[in-house]
Amino acid sequence: MTEKKKVVVAMSGGVDSTLTAKLLLEAGYEVCGATMHQFDGQEKEIEGARAMADFLGIPFQVVDVREAYQKFVLRYFIDAYAKGMTPNPCMMCDFKVKFGLFYDEARKHFDAPYFATGHYARILFHPERQKYEVHKGIDMGKDQSYMMYHLTQDQLAHIIFPLGRAFKKDTRRISKEKGLPTYNKAESQDICFLTSETSYVEFLKNHAPEAFSEGDIVDTKGRVLGRHRGIPYYTIGQRKGLGIAARTPLYVVALKPEKSQVIVGTNDELFRTRLLADELHFTDGEAPGEEFSCQAKIRYGIRVHDCTVTLERNGRAVVKFKEPQRAITSGQSVVFYDGDRLIGGGTIVRGL
């Protein structure tokens, strides 16, 4: 008798992860469930995941990642805002925790070669190139390939995304048809360590009150227009809540925490054709070349734009777009594609 392939499913107790586990069971895998213990106060979420594992009749394990989560996600989130950047905590959690410590520990605990999540992306093996590739999910409105540019070839050989060929609008219907009690469960929030009662500003005030020193709001010519309440209240492209009067609409075009300044300008001044990126990762393990043409996006949920990427000797890259991009934001990710295929990505240092 052929031994079943064993896979650990990252379970949250939600619609997508529960359906992922069910689909893998139906495909003949030996399925185990695991969930991350990221921070205190998660008892309800952990028990929800455990309940779904029990419902499916699969073994379940909680993996304590609190120390790594504190270091790589919470500390990063706080430090980024203090530096005038707009962090991407979900990306960092995937990179350092979910597909880092959790990926390693969950597979080790169950002695399982495979690891699956409910992400909407596809992993394909290209026989001619002898490379694993990440491709966009077929549901372009839900595609999460943007989050996967840090994955290595070794990881891609052991990761399964069963929902990559599904449409989000169908997952609740399919879940209901399969008798899964999660079919009508609400979607999870974007930043999991924030509650409905705690905004990111309140969180930062509790953990980094020094970041909220007041300062000047100045225009691009250096003229003082007013006062701001603290750098973390503002992000690139913001118009509302500036508290200044002007004849034309003004937007945040830059943040200078070292001077405690918020720089404002016109909508036209938000556009840049170039950006500088660092912390680069490429799915193939190396870049396509020292200079290459591709498509890129500068934040999740927008369309890609044609560009040229030029690598620098210091490990950074200059990305030049054919069309100006609005509100290039330090701390967000720029991600590169060749059609549907993910090439890689990096962290935006600043617009140029």
Mark where each language-model region is:
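ATP-dependent adenylation/nucleotidyltransferase module used to activate substrates
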Residues: 1-149, 160, 169-170, 176
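AMP-forming adenylation/ATP pyrophosphatase catalytic core
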Residues: 116-123, 128-352
